[in-house]
């Protein structure tokens, strides 16, 4: 796949909701192609998402911060 098209990644785990209104879902994805093939990273996703979905990531360098529990 060409670099300008993105990198496919499979959702392997849904971690939780984040964002001020809970409209963002934090997920763990496994990169399927490219330089980081096989790497598992944490990303934030907007919109509906399920385990097994394939996302196209523009880049695989950045990783979302872990969701902290509120006290």
From Swiss-Prot:
One of its GO terms (molecular function) is structural constituent of ribosome. Belongs to the eukaryotic ribosomal protein eS28 family. NCBIfam families: PRK04007.1. It comes from Pyrococcus abyssi (strain GE5 / Orsay). GO terms for biological process: maturation of SSU-rRNA; ribosomal small subunit assembly; translation. InterPro entries: NA-bd_OB-fold, Ribosomal_eS28, Ribosomal_eS28_CS. The gene is rps28e. The keyword Membrane does not apply. One of its GO terms (cellular component) is cytosolic small ribosomal subunit. This is Small ribosomal subunit protein eS28. Keywords: Ribonucleoprotein, Ribosomal protein. PANTHER family: 40S RIBOSOMAL PROTEIN S28 (PTHR10769), SMALL RIBOSOMAL SUBUNIT PROTEIN ES28 (PTHR10769:SF3).
